């Protein structure tokens, strides 16, 4: 059975708001336009998604401190989770996932803190989410150190934890840190993660990478992004996603064609990341749910 996940949140919010990207990314919408977040969740469920991923990716101390309100983490975490829950309840079925983004910055594993610093941060985050979500998902983990720190903290939760790793867009056999993807597999078993996915990488890289997960004992999956590449200038908190260009060739049909290859390689969890929207999820749902 194939489980259809939702698609990207941040880029979809920018598209719908009609404004420019802001340094606070999807957090800006949580503060100023929560109804837009609700609409995105609703549209993903209507497109066939079985999971609403709460808009909590950037609700972490380093991001909040940078923007001047570190004391609001629990409040914002709860607000985002409740929006996802309401969408699930409106739809009448589905699950809610609590997103946990990388510390430091996305795609920049060299900026992540040491494991003994990261683990308690994620432990706090899952405590704030666990009352509301069905499971947590560590996203865009780009090095073995990021994975270990994330899993060490997140698996303190009583709820299941999924792990999603991001790979090099040229060499899909390697994490963005340069380490081999297979180095993550022992950590999945050590910490008891319930699923292992590839995320926020090009569909081509994921197609090369997913066969390397075949030895994993838990369900595997993938959700790619629709960026041309990850610009070197997109490298710090405060950078805006308008530094990243959208691919024009990644139509829903072509994206689903890539997903066919992932399923053939053993994936059972399929969705989308940045620049992959409701139309893409609808095509996935049509192919696998009929």
Give the ranges of each region predicted by the language model.
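Domain-level signal for soluble alpha/beta catalytic cores
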Residues: 1-290
């Amino acid at each position: 059975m194939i489980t259809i996940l939702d698609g990207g949140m941040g880029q979809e919010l920018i598209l719908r708001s009609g404004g420019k990207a802001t340094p606070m990314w999807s957090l800006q919408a949580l503060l100023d336009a929560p109804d837009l977040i609700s609409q995105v969740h609703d549209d993903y469920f209507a497109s066939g998604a079985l999971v609403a991923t709460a808009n909590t990716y950037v609700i972490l101390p380093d991001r909040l401190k940078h923007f001047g309100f570190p004391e609001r983490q629990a409040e914002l975490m709860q607000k985002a989770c409740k929006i996802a829950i309401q969408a699930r309840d409106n739809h009448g079925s589905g699950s809610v996932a609590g997103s946990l983004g990388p510390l430091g910055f996305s795609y920049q594993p060299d900026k992540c803190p040491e494991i003994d610093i990261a683990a308690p941060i994620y432990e706090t985050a899952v405590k704030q989410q666990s009352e509301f979500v069905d499971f947590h998902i560590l996203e865009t983990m780009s090095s073995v150190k990021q994975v270990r720190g994330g899993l060490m903290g997140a698996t303190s939760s009583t709820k299941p934890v999924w792990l999603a790793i991001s790979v090099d867009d040229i060499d899909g056999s390697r994490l963005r840190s340069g380490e081999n993807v297979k180095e993550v597999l022992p950590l999945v078993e050590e910490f008891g993660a319930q699923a292992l996915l590839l995320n926020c990488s090009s569909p081509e890289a994921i197609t090369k990478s997913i066969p390397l997960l075949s030895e994993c004992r838990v369900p595997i999956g993938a959700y790619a992004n629709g960026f041309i590449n990850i610009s070197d200038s997109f490298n710090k908190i405060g950078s805006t996603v308008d530094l990243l260009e959208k691919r024009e060739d990644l139509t829903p049909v072509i994206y689903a064609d890539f997903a066919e290859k992932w399923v053939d390689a053993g994936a059972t969890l399929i969705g989308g990341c940045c620049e992959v929207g409701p139309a893409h999820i609808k095509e996935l749902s049509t192919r696998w749910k009929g």
